Amino acid sequence: MGGSSGGGVSYRSGGESDVELEDYEVDDFRDGIVESRGNRFNPLTNFLGLDFAGGSGGKFTVINGIRDISRGSIVHPDNRWYKAWTMFILIWALYSSFFTPLEFGFFRGLPENLFILDIAGQIAFLVDIVLTFFVAYRDSRTYRMIYKRSSIALRYLKSTFIIDLLACMPWDIIYKAAGEKEEVRYLLLIRLYRVHRVILFFHKMEKDIRINYLFTRIVKLIFVELYCTHTAACIFYYLATTLPASQEGYTWIGSLKLGDYSYSKFREIDLWTRYTTSMYFAVVTMATVGYGDIHAVNMREMIFAMVYISFDMILGAYLIGNMTALIVKGSKTERFRDKMADIMRYMNRNKLGRNIRGQITGHLRLQYESSYTEAAVLQDIPVSIRAKIAQTLYLPYIEKVPLFRGCSSEFINQIVIRLHEEFFLPGEVIMEQGSVVDQLYFVCHGVLEEIGITKDGSEEIVAVLQPDHSFGEISILCNIPQPYTVRVAELCRILRLDKQSFMNILEIFFHDGRRILNNLLEGKESNVRIKQLESDITFHISKQEAELALKLNSAAFYGDLYQLKSLIRAGGDPNKTDYDGRSPLHLAASRGYEDITLYLIQESVDVNIKDKLGSTPLLEAIKNGNDRVAALLVKEGATLNIENAGTFLCTVVAKGDSDFLKRLLSNGIDPNSKDYDHRTPLHVAASEGFYVLAIQLVEASANVLAKDRWGNTPLDEALGCGNKMLIKLLEDAKNSQISSFPSGSKEPKDKVYKKKCTVYFSHPGDSKEKRRRGIVLWVPRSIEELIRTAKEQLNVPEASCVLSEDEAKIIDVDLISDGQKLYLAVET
């Protein structure tokens, strides 16, 4: 692999390869290797969050952070000023972790300078306690950031709040105030818990790839060893101070004599000498070398020495094991040698050529030297990050593919993140004519040929595929065998997409699937191979539209509004019908889904569309007792529009379905509709003796005097039935209807039923979006009364006339048909 002028990827010398760069790229067909190297200390500086040289808008100040706290805002743990604060507290935690054992062992009451420093440290930790109540945290189960104040406080109170608060207590002052009781000094050891902050810091450093791992681990192990021996040294000295001065000879340090130097009256010796001697005792005891110059004297010292040495056995195993794992890494070289030996045996057994041998060995050596393989690097990376990598690498190529011209960015992104990169040498056949295709390919670099095999077996070059072309799409989309053989002419870099992944994406992005098929058809004039397959593509388009209509109806039937919206946004036509002529509005109305009905109305569907059985959505809603849905449809101008309404209504009455009849009458069906025998629904109700249904029909202005084919009226049918209540009802209705007409008229006309109309205050030419909401009214006896009522209901006192949908002025109510849309206007 060649390097660029800017420098290549650098590695450590020796058997081990350790990449020192923060970012690097390896690119065969790109511009080379790009590398950006800065100061060797920059990664550590960035890790500590101490790079404050930002722009003017994002400049860090602690004052700004304190202002955020004062306003009650929640601080993100990655906030730059909070990171700086954690580094500040880390320094205090490191100081406190080492000074606390020292204070416990060597001091009984701090001198003034150390006392002031101790108080300053405790104040800093108190501020940190308050700040912790304002810092968001990541939930361990959901991995979401929690910003709720009560949750943050409750979590902290349940965890380390008590320990942190007790650690901040001024135990030196309390010790003196309590009469220098030794038991109080033991509470000082609570501050040792602060060492967990240092441990967490090392954990973060180990996970930061910008900082050398070997260096981090060695520093951590040295810290562990020093801290353990430091603490043990302080405890050894503390045990010696627990005996009175008169018994100093019974302590390890009071009885100690090194050469001519005696440690009698050791309390008067300077602090540095005492600490160094204690540290020496702790280190040699931990190392178990046992020189014998310092040893335990009294029983308490012996017991602690035994416990300490037992602990040192575990600590020593931990330190040695970690150091061995860090230093001994010959296994990597051994794995490379074993793998190379296996490859050589394989190549010899299969007698591979020199060219392919060189490629294989070169690839393995590159893997070893660079510690890089694409699959190994990406397999542990989250899918979202792998998707971003794929978009960076492949999106520029896929956007130029003519097959995806006009497709949505979301669809293209889904294609990109599922691509696999492959390379092919000249002469290789990728697809054979007549084979079943399971992959879709896109050309990034190189040249391929589409070859057709004629009847006599000769080859004919049909097309030349260059960068930004695709192949395999016709076989996949139309579900036919591969029409041509695809062979590599020049070294090619190709992106592969599995058929199943492609079809899964198309099921979600329907509109883009149709766009792809249209792109194929649009290119048929310039592409002979596609022109020959035009009928297959057209058939597939029709099949796709039928499947989409079924999916829309299925979503409407099951009340899945989200799926319905997704399908319509993806290009589904809500006016398309299934094999029975039923639209999504039919199914939503029949199931009583108000939300879906309202959404479909907003999508400007035809509210009066009929299925193959002649049913409208309004009729479906009424059949199933969905009155609220029916009201929505009526408000939008929906009508029953039933063919052979008389026969239909007579059938309903014959079944005795009073609820259904009531809903039909309230939604504008003509109660005087007649069947093939000129019988009205009232004829059927009277003949069957349905008193309740007869009342409903009479109240809906059914004509009592209407005659059937044989000249019988409903009253005649009731007399034949013999139902006295029904006879009286019809006689009263007859007298009422006769009296409501002039004396010269013997019978009222047929169809003296009420008519409804929908009145809008807008111009008939306005679109549905601009039209104001109208009102449904019964048609009164005069046009003046209709205008007056509409003006009052719509609150437009200036209106003076009514227009039809054709912008014609209506001057008589007899000209208004049932369910007609009218427009209230100002006459000029």
UniProtKB/Swiss-Prot annotation:
InterPro entries: Ankyrin_rpt, Ankyrin_rpt-contain_sf, cNMP-bd_dom, cNMP-bd_dom_sf, Ion_trans_dom, K_chnl_volt-dep_EAG/ELK/ERG, KAT/AKT, KHA_dom. One of its GO terms (biological process) is potassium ion transport. Residues 108-114, 180-185, 242-276, 297-300 are extracellular. The chain crosses the membrane at residues 87-107, 115-135, 159-179, 186-206, 221-241, 301-321. A nucleoside 3',5'-cyclic phosphate binds at residues 403-523. GO terms for cellular component: monoatomic ion channel complex. Expressed in root pericycle and xylem parenchyma, and in flower at a lower level. ANK repeats lie at residues 545-576, 580-609, 613-642, 644-673, 677-706, 710-740. Pfam families: Ank_2 (PF12796), cNMP_binding (PF00027), Ion_trans (PF00520), KHA (PF11834). One of its GO terms (molecular function) is outward rectifier potassium channel activity. It is a multi-pass membrane protein. The keyword NADP does not apply. Loss-of-function mutation skor-1 leads to a reduced shoot potassium content. This is Potassium channel SKOR. The lineage of its organism: Eukaryota, Viridiplantae, Streptophyta, Embryophyta, Tracheophyta.
